[in-house]
Amino acid sequence: LRPDHANRRRRRAGAERPGRVPPARPYSIDDDTDFLPAVKRSIRGWKIAYSPDLDVFPVDPQVSRVIDAQVKAFEEEGAHVEEVKVGIRRPQQELSDLWCRLIIPRNITGLDAAKAGGVDLLGEHHQDFPAEYLRWIAVGQHLSAVDFYKDQEIRTEIYDAIQSVLNDYDLLVTPTLACLPVDNANDGNTVGPSEINGEQVDPLIGWCLTYPLNFTGHPAASIPAGLSEEGLPVGMQIIGR
């Protein structure tokens, strides 16, 4: 944690004040925490869990080598690092589908609001949307309330798995991404790989080890961990309570 990160976090934290537009969100917390002391806080004696793959993600060997080496930095600072099984049992392809199902209704309502305001994005600019996005819009149009509640049950499973680790450890560390960076597409629709280590992944999101934390709400930060053999950046995700 750097001082600029700590200052930014302090300014963004806390409840929104009455009279602000938009109005205060009901789940915000009025907590004036000073994060600057954490910059110099020791981690000596901390227990840190290390999951190379959140149990279910295929990870590029170059990514694994960098993260395996860099977790030793925690030990050099006096922490105790243990490799763990998180307990996630759902296949990663099922989890990436879950993320898309959960995020697409908000997209649909946003598109509907724009249309009500006189801007029909799907009607007037249909050809400008990626095919993957249009496919999920179509799926989202047919989701039911029962589907929604079934998906919430899966979210609970993921939360319980992550929290069970953090009940015994101070932090959980993983790779940020399962793959190395990809080239930007010429058509503006850059996606990730469709396969890692011979296993199919969703090119939209299936190579990210970050989105399961969208299910759980645990605080998480990604930091630079090193470079691949080709000099490409590799990130490390640090998950807290």
Report each predicted region and the residues it spans:
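A short helix-breaking turn/cap at a secondary-structure junction
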Residues: 1-71, 77, 117-118
